[in-house]
A protein has these predicted regions:
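N-terminal helix-loop segment corresponding to the beta1-alpha1 unit
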Residues: 9-182
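A glycine-rich dinucleotide-binding beta-alpha-beta segment and adjacent secondary-structure elements
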Residues: 1
Length: 182
């Protein structure tokens, strides 16, 4: 075997064929590693939607929950030829999308119905916010003990900076990484 001659096979085997139907070739069907898992992605912007995208790309059924007015990333440039945000479209591909106002009683009931049957719940609402609306891990894991709960926040759920708002650029500056990128 020539060095590098099996590269495509390694890529297809290790990462799956990049086709959305997950078939390696016409004769053999590839079953994605997360096929059969249901993920509720109640995140916005960059980090959370990217996590949801990785799960969707690995075969999970991902349902993106957007607030009334949509994910704020829908307003980001650059735009696709159809006028939508390229970043939003890229990070939210292969997901179903529902608009639910989880701050209202009706919206909370809708979201709880989805989370009850889910395998994974993603939220980036900020420390303590999910608990305030009845979506903290301690509450929803009672109805769904198998649930994997991922709460994303810049500085974690506890600690001196937990309530500080931030962005990726601020974190890069705090860590010194910004010095390497200019």
């Amino acid at each position: 075997v020539e060095p590098g001659s099996d590269t495509q096979h390694i890529i297809d085997t290790g990462f799956g064929n990049q086709q959305t139907d997950f078939k390696q070739n016409q004769d053999e069907e590839f079953i994605a590693p997360l096929a059969g898992l249901k993920v509720i992605d109640a995140t916005q912007g960059y980090t959370g939607p990217y996590v949801g995208l990785m799960l969707a790309e690995a075969g999970a059924e991902v349902i993106k929950i957007e607030p009334k007015g949509g994910d704020w990333a829908r307003d980001l440039a650059p735009r696709t030829p159809t006028g939508s945000s390229a970043l939003f479209e890229s990070f939210n591909r292969n997901k179903d999308s529902k608009t639910i106002d989880w701050t209202s009683k009706d919206g909370q009931a809708q979201l709880k119905g989805l989370v009850k049957d889910a395998d994974v719940f993603l939220e980036d609402w900020g420390p303590g916010v999910a608990e305030g609306y009845g979506f903290g891990y301690g509450t929803i894991s009672k109805e769904n003990p198998k649930l994997v709960y991922l709460a994303l926040s810049a500085y974690g759920e506890k600690g001196p900076f937990r309530d500080r708002p931030t962005s990726e650029l601020v974190i890069q500056g705090m860590t010194g990484y910004l010095r390497t990128t200019g």
